[in-house]
């Protein structure tokens, strides 16, 4: 079994996070590098997962008011480490820190079964950027 550690994000983690984003094809986060870096610096929820001997292999980033809502902006695990329960561990870690909040997130259709398996249910939402 792999030994992992969840810890608070540090600025020195950013380049590795961007590598994971690039490998996943999340080009918007990679191309908007400075905006993404600022997003991490301004996030109230920002944790990484380290695997022993391999460094950062995943992360979770979000925003919360600490009482009612916690919004997950991104949750991503390196492809080599998926299926080991790391994403589940990150979600549980965050929910333990903010037990009174409901967690909300947008997710891809391919991750639906993962989130439903963790007890999350679909909800309806909207999205718009200023340029639209």
What are these regions (language model features)?
Residues 1-31, 126:
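Short amphipathic alpha-helix that is part of the acyltransferase structural core
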Residues 9, 75-77, 111:
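Hydrophobic adenine-recognition pocket in adenosine-nucleotide-binding enzymes
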Residues 37-48:
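A short helix-loop-beta-strand connector motif used in the catalytic cores of GNAT acetyltransferases and
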Residues 48, 55-64, 71, 76:
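Conserved beta-strand in the GNAT
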Residues 77, 83-96:
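Conserved acetyl-CoA-binding loop-helix of GNAT-fold acetyltransferases
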Residues 96-109:
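Conserved GNAT acetyl-CoA-binding A-motif
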Residues 115, 120:
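Conserved active-site tyrosine of GNAT-family acetyltransferases
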Residues 121-132:
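Active-site/acyl-donor-binding loops of N-acyltransferases
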């Amino acid at each position: 079994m792999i030994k992992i550690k969840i810890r608070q994000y540090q600025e020195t983690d950013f380049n590795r996070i961007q590598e994971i984003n690039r490998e996943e094809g999340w080009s918007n986060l990679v191309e908007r590098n400075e905006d993404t870096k600022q997003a991490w610096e301004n996030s109230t929820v920002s944790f990484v997962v380290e695997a022993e001997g391999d460094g950062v292999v995943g992360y979770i980033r979000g925003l919360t008011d600490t009482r009612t809502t916690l919004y997950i902006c991104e949750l991503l695990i390196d492809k080599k480490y998926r299926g080991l329960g790391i994403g589940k561990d990150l979600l549980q870690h965050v929910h333990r820190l903010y037990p009174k909040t409901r967690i909300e997130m947008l997710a891809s259709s391919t991750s639906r079964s993962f989130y439903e398996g963790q007890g999350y249910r679909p909800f309806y939402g909207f999205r718009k950027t200023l340029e639209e």
